[in-house]
Amino acid sequence: ADLATACHKQGISLHLYYSHLDWHRLDYPLGRTGLKLGRPTDKQNYDEYFKFMNRQLTELLTNYGPVDCIWFDGWWDHDSDAKPFDWRLDEQYRLIHQLQPQCLVANNHHQSPYAGEDIQIFERDVPGENKAGLSGQEVSQLPLETCQTMNDTWGYNITDKNYKSADEIVRLLVSTAG
């Protein structure tokens, strides 16, 4: 609540990160990244996990004032499943837009945008290049985003000193903007 209050007070739009992937909850159906966790697989139940996610999203979208964007991640955990995994995004996006019609939806799923999404994301890449092998989808007419690290890791790593130069960061931004 403090973050939302401070953002609203300062006129800063509130964007929230939400991971579809959850290695902690037993009802999350493990994808390729969680198969070696040693967790039991008999409790996996996407219907229950989907209800849990939507309860969380409802809380986030009703208790903290205007939310300008939900940025999803982790969908790629099931990108190598033999049968395509149905995340039921249409239902989830409908819920978001019912609760906050102005809220943008972005999903870092490495696919072409789905109905209900407002931003196309290119992870560790710029539109049309696919150097990282994660962004081979066609470039849409939606606003574009490049999802980058400032060095080589997503989280804090005391030994990672390989920071991008200011020129490289500007090149990434300009290349994404077109």
Predicted regions and their residues:
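Mature catalytic domains of secreted/periplasmic carbohydrate-active enzymes
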Residues: A1-G178
